[in-house]
């Protein structure tokens, strides 16, 4: 975004910064406007370093380019959300919008701020306006950032889409029409890379499929199982056939599936072959299923999604059809007092009935919090209410937020939340409704910091914990408030001289850059993201003691895998390493890491 200065002399964001967006969005945003003026002022009054009205720029112009080839993009639509400004770029990718003349009486016009290339169009009762660029076949580029100055060229970079396309072939040599193909992408959540399910498409009459508007990254493909409904080949009452799910390049296991690495603008061909197999009726009795209860049933072959069964509440059985193989069938109920069960099932050339599944109530785990605070006076307050009763909160229940998430890829949410207080004196923290599985503990505190969290010998700040049937080992948490302090400077920004005759203001500025404090592997510490002010400064008054690698980037890094030691090894020679003791105040200087590094 382009940074601007409002009428009261405070500064606002300066450079064109574009957030990372999903592949389906083909737009580039450039902040141009807005702010509500608090009085009638002239352009000359806005600040001592502002341009005079007769020096105001008369237009905003620029070029839309391909961020890979840097070639101009012709006939790209550039416009504001309200379409007050809108036009197609010419054959050289250029666009230019005429701007209204500065009006000192109404308080509209352009103002140049203290930092280089700053400009803001403001209106007395305006709202934020962004320039967006659209072009079929292009995406937003999350790694690029442009700067512009009044009357100068603004460059908006778009990223060419990547494509995965292919053909599905059937062992019967029939046309694979209507086969569902699904894509999975590797994305970072809470600092951990995970495989997440994406969109699905159906093959056309030629068995072809196509995934468009893909950003650079890692992908996997799979087909959903489908039945052979050919009326000519199907005999009433006879054997039924289907096509089991297949993972690219032709394996039955998600973990063994090949990873497709895509670069910007790249097209990859990925063909899949399906084998027709006999399907057999399967049935699994549920001992304590409810007649009207809802139940989620999942089926795993080797590992991963693909097969499906359903629950028949009338007969209290899990039913469906599967091909030959060994399966793990899991079932879970919803809501309070939820339960789960698991059985193994083998299908070998005939209808199969599994052993009876017994649903067992999910586990609850107590959290024992030990406070080692040096500051005894804390004025935090809060209440809990269910609409009928209201209780005041005390102790860790007031300041400690506790959550869990599945530790493994593609795992469905398995519950796990803090039990509401049962009365005004109930300060106990209990994680309830935890189904069997592996979990990651997530802790955030509004007071002090989490010094340690363990479950037996397991360090929950770095390792997952396992919940089995009847798990009751408590989680022990230690809280402290002797945090460290960190001040720093991004030297690349701090040494950039301002424009001639200009001053720099960091008040209300949007960040010039972002600093990430990444705890070193297996050590104490807590990840932090810090904003860098216009003068290159950043600070954190509440750093958890520990060792960190401090990294600085021009743009936000939402996909930084800070919990993945192997992935973060790429930054072993970048940034600065600091060691913070309890209560220590430290200062650090770092340089920006360019998008090409």
Enumerate the predicted regions with their spans.
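N-terminal secretory signal peptides that target proteins for export/translocation
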Residues: 1-26
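Long luminal/extracellular ectodomains of secretory-pathway precursor proteins
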Residues: 2-4, 32, 36-37, 41-597
């Amino acid at each position: 975004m382009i940074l601007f200065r409002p009428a009261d002399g405070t500064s606002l964001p300066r450079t064109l910064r574009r957030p990372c967006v999903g592949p389906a969005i083909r737009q580039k945003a450039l902040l141009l406007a807005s702010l509500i003026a608090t009085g009638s002022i002239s352009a000359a009054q806005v600040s001592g370093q502002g341009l005079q009205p007769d020096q105001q720029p008369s237009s905003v112009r620029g070029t839309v380019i391909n961020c890979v080839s840097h070639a101009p993009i012709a006939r790209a639509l550039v416009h504001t959300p309200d379409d007050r400004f809108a036009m197609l770029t010419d054959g050289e990718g250029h666009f230019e919008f005429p701007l209204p003349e500065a009006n000192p009486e109404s308080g509209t016009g352009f103002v140049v701020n203290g930092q280089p290339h700053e400009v803001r169009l403001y209106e007395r009762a305006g709202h934020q306006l962004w320039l967006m660029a659209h072009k079929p076949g292009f995406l937003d580029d999350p790694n690029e950032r442009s700067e512009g100055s009044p009357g100068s060229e603004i460059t908006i970079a778009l990223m060419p889409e990547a494509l995965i396309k292919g053909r599905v072939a059937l062992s019967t040599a029939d046309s694979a029409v209507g086969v569902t193909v699904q894509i999975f992408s590797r994305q970072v959540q809470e600092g951990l890379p995970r495989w997440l399910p994406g969109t699905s498409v159906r093959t056309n009459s030629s068995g072809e499929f196509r995934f468009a508007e893909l950003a650079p990254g890692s992908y996997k493909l799979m087909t959903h199982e489908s039945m052979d409904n050919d009326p000519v080949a199907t005999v009433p009452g006879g054997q039924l056939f289907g096509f089991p799910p297949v993972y690219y390049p032709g394996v039955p296991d998600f973990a063994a599936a090949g990873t497709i690495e895509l670069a910007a603008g790249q097209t990859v061909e990925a063909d899949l072959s399906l084998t027709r197999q006999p399907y057999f009726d399967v049935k699994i009795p549920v001992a304590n299923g409810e007649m009207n209860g809802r139940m989620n049933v999942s089926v795993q072959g080797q590992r991963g999604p693909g097969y499906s069964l359903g629950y028949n509440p009338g007969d209290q059985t899990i039913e469906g059809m599967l091909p030959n193989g060994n399966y793990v069938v899991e079932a879970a109920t919803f809501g309070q007092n939820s339960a789960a069960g698991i059985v193994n099932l083998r299908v070998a050339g005939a209808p199969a009935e599994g052993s009876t599944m017994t649903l067992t109530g999910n586990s609850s785990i107590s959290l024992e919090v030990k406070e080692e605070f040096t500051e005894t006076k804390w004025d935090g307050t809060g209440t809990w209410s269910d609409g009928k009763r209201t209780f005041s909160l005390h102790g860790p229940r007031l300041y400690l937020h506790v959550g869990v998430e599945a530790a493994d890829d593609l795992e469905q949410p398995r519950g796990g939340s803090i039990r509401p207080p049962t009365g005004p004196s109930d300060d106990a923290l209990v994680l309830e409704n935890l189904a069997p599985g592996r979990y990651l503990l997530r802790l955030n505190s509004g007071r002090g910091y989490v010094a340690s969290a363990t479950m037996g010998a397991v360090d929950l700040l770095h390792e997952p914990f396992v919940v089995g049937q009847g798990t009751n080992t408590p989680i022990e948490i230690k809280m402290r408030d002797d945090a460290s302090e960190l001040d720093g400077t991004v030297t690349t920004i701090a040494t950039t001289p301002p424009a001639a005759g200009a001053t720099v203001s960091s008040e209300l500025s949007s960040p010039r850059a972002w600093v990430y404090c990444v705890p070193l592997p297996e050590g104490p510490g807590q990840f932090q993201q810090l904003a860098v002010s216009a003068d290159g400064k950043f600070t954190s008054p509440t750093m958890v003691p520990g060792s960190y690698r401090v990294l600085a980037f021009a743009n936000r890094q939402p996909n930084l895998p800070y919990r993945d030691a192997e992935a973060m090894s790429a930054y072993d020679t970048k940034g600065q390493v600091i060691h913070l003791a309890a209560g220590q105040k430290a200062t650090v200087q770092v340089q920006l890491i360019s998008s090409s590094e």
